[in-house]
Amino acid sequence: MIGLVGKKLGMTRIFTEDGVSIPVTVIEIEANRVTQVKDLANDGYRAVQVTTGSKKANRVTKPEAGHFAKAGVEAGRGLWEFRTAEGEEFTAGQNISVEIFAEVKKVDVTGTSKGKGFAGTVKRWNFRTQDATHGNSLSHRVPGSIGQNQTPGKVFKGKKMAGHLGDERVTVQSLDVVRVDAERNLLLVKGAVPGATGGNLIVKPAVKA
């Protein structure tokens, strides 16, 4: 089963009949319009390409305009692709709604995390701080040693150091689907998802469900 592209609207909470409060993220999933269907013969793999939302006409490039026109769909805010299994049939111009999640219990949500700029090792990697006193005057939040000696004579790749934090692709797995509101194109999932309000999200059935 493919996933869908939505937009993060924010968080709220809903109550069960027992009065238990459930924190939920509200994801708006407008109809995903199929722009291209890929197959083994022409592309070497099976996939469906979709778009959603809208884009100002003066922001659409000529190649994009031709691509959307060929599929007979309105220009969207981006293009996304989902692999399809043998037997799953889609056609260009088809609309796929949030209702496909009606029977799904858990989903994986992918988004771009909030960028937090340049951060030190304590904030970025949860390094412990060094002594506040006991003779330590200047090295409270420094990372400490970053290597060994003449052997190996280099800093290993992947060493955790200060740098840019956030603004990267993150996936949160196995979030419970709390409600599917097909009338308002909303999907409510339990817990938090990556990214800022208004950010694009990719929602797929959970791989570990």
From Swiss-Prot:
Database matches in InterPro entries: Ribosomal_uL3, Ribosomal_uL3_bac/org-type, Ribosomal_uL3_CS, Transl_B-barrel_sf
PTM comment text: Methylated by PrmB.
Alphabetical list of PROSITE patterns matching this protein: RIBOSOMAL_L3 (PS00474)
Biological process according to GO: translation
Superkingdom of source: Bacteria
HAMAP family referenced in this protein's UniProt entry, alphabetically: Ribosomal_uL3_B
Function: One of the primary rRNA binding proteins, it binds directly near the 3'-end of the 23S rRNA, where it nucleates assembly of the 50S subunit.
Sequence similarity: Belongs to the universal ribosomal protein uL3 family.
Oligomer status and interactors: Part of the 50S ribosomal subunit. Forms a cluster with proteins L14 and L19.
This protein's name: Large ribosomal subunit protein uL3
